[in-house]
Amino acid sequence: EGFEDFCREQQIPHRVFLHEMKDQTASQEHLKEILSEIEADSPGRKKGIFVSNDTHASILVNLLVRKYGKLPEDYLIVGFDDSPASRNAIFPISTVAQQIDMLATEAVKLLVEQIEEHKNSKHTPVSEPVHKMITPVLIRRETTERDLLAEDN
């Protein structure tokens, strides 16, 4: 929802595709269909594609390279989760990463707080879940930074 809210606020045209991708074959087929729709809707325009995980982003990059022999300049691709697939792809994939160290620190703090509350309140259970927001970070790699890489050469 955050992505859609941002696009609406910034008046950025966007589409959301929701498909269950159970295995590699299904993922490839769904991503091929999505790619065809995007290309039909946006000929000659830059296409920013945010994919729900790095594995599917890698499949999408592979489909584009197979089709065009390269990663076209008008495609900017971002995955999610900073998995090894994003770092090891033929074109390293830009990705949104969770800050695992901060998540772990906050989880331990919450656990310690709950243990202390439990000791002090005679075993009263926590009544409401605790929500903490850890801001993810964008790791820029070749699927969004090709213009910058070309300038460096």
Residue map of PLM features:
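Flexible loop/turn connectors
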Residues: 15, 28, 35-152
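Short, surface-exposed alpha-helical segments at coil->helix boundaries
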Residues: 1-4, 105
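Short beta-strand elements in bilobed, periplasmic/extracellular small-molecule ligand-binding domains
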Residues: 4-29
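A conserved amphipathic alpha-helix that caps or lines the catalytic cleft of carbohydrate-
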Residues: 3, 7, 61-64
